[in-house]
Amino acid sequence: MRHRKSGRQLNRNSSHRQAMFRNMAGSLVRHEIIKTTLPKAKELRRVVEPLITLAKTDSVANRRLAFARTRDNEIVAKLFNELGPRFASRAGGYTRILKCGFRAGDNAPMAYIELVDRPEAQAEAVAE
């Protein structure tokens, strides 16, 4: 029985899941919007939101924790230099999930996951 087991398996083993969400979190931080399946978007929210909360307090220890979770210095720099200050006054809820139909081929439910309060110029050019 799977009672009280949180998180989705997504038909992957744990190392594949960890690598996938590490890559997806980096893409979301870099582009501020990505298109993926709805279950992956819902699970990605559980990875990205704590990273942004961590970035609100700039310290060497927090930067090392963020690097341990993302393994990308460019992502860590953007988190602490741009996103942390941008969301300093927001107490959680940094992402938004927008459903966008179904994928051709397997009819999987698709969704955009984006960071709220994106700059307007970037909001118009939707990256997929």
Curated annotation (Swiss-Prot):
Disulfide pairings: none
Keyword Transmembrane set for record: no
Keyword Ribonucleoprotein: yes
Listed GO MF terms: structural constituent of ribosome
Gene Ontology CC entries for this record: cytosolic large ribosomal subunit
A single BP term in Gene Ontology: translation
Superkingdom: Bacteria
Swiss-Prot/TrEMBL keywords: Ribonucleoprotein, Ribosomal protein
Coiled-coil stretches: none
Short name of any one Pfam family annotated for the protein: Ribosomal_L17
Family under the similarity heading: Belongs to the bacterial ribosomal protein bL17 family.
Subunit architecture: Part of the 50S ribosomal subunit. Contacts protein L32.
Family annotation (PANTHER family): LARGE RIBOSOMAL SUBUNIT PROTEIN BL17M, RIBOSOMAL PROTEIN L17
Record-given protein name: Large ribosomal subunit protein bL17
Organism of provenance: Erwinia tasmaniensis (strain DSM 17950 / CFBP 7177 / CIP 109463 / NCPPB 4357 / Et1/99)
Gene: rplQ
